[in-house]
């Protein structure tokens, strides 16, 4: 770990279509092997599917989904006296967003639809309705934090 100073965070450019930084972060999370144009087409086609299925603005559905997925608490390992404890901690705003995007893509990839566009659209719609794999992951994270509440005094 660096001792001198905190590393500066790199600022991403806003998405040209939706003019949103979180959309750019989602595209970067979807991207595999540096193929950004493929990731962009996947996302924009998924948003078109969302618009057809819900008759709502896809950016609004996506925003609700991210709010529903974002965790407030998580557990972090802390070594105290020779044993490791899972200590519940609050999650920073930046990490909330990062975890939400990561879980959204992870559980979209595990879905059974045919194309990635359909998988992503389905997961976003499910997350906005408080269903789906990403929501289940958040609930599991909360259960872990709740069951380890006794170790909260080890927080740093």
UniProtKB/Swiss-Prot annotation:
<dbReference type="Pfam" id="PF00177">
    <property type="entry name" value="Ribosomal_S7"/>
</dbReference>
<dbReference type="InterPro" id="IPR036823">
    <property type="entry name" value="Ribosomal_uS7_dom_sf"/>
</dbReference>
<dbReference type="GO" id="GO:0019843">
    <property type="term" value="F:rRNA binding"/>
</dbReference>
<keyword id="KW-0689">Ribosomal protein</keyword>
<protein>
    <recommendedName>
        <fullName>Small ribosomal subunit protein uS7</fullName>
    </recommendedName>
</protein>
<dbReference type="InterPro" id="IPR020606">
    <property type="entry name" value="Ribosomal_uS7_CS"/>
</dbReference>
<comment type="function">
    <text>One of the primary rRNA binding proteins, it binds directly to 16S rRNA where it nucleates assembly of the head domain of the 30S subunit. Is located at the subunit interface close to the decoding center, probably blocks exit of the E-site tRNA.</text>
</comment>
<dbReference type="InterPro" id="IPR005717">
    <property type="entry name" value="Ribosomal_uS7_bac/org-type"/>
</dbReference>
<keyword id="KW-0820">tRNA-binding</keyword>
<keyword id="KW-0699">rRNA-binding</keyword>
<dbReference type="InterPro" id="IPR023798">
    <property type="entry name" value="Ribosomal_uS7_dom"/>
</dbReference>
<dbReference type="InterPro" id="IPR000235">
    <property type="entry name" value="Ribosomal_uS7"/>
</dbReference>
<dbReference type="GO" id="GO:0006412">
    <property type="term" value="P:translation"/>
</dbReference>
<comment type="subunit">
    <text>Part of the 30S ribosomal subunit. Contacts proteins S9 and S11.</text>
</comment>
<dbReference type="GO" id="GO:0015935">
    <property type="term" value="C:small ribosomal subunit"/>
</dbReference>
<keyword id="KW-0687">Ribonucleoprotein</keyword>
<dbReference type="GO" id="GO:0003735">
    <property type="term" value="F:structural constituent of ribosome"/>
</dbReference>
<comment type="similarity">
    <text>Belongs to the universal ribosomal protein uS7 family.</text>
</comment>
<dbReference type="GO" id="GO:0000049">
    <property type="term" value="F:tRNA binding"/>
</dbReference>
<keyword id="KW-0694">RNA-binding</keyword>
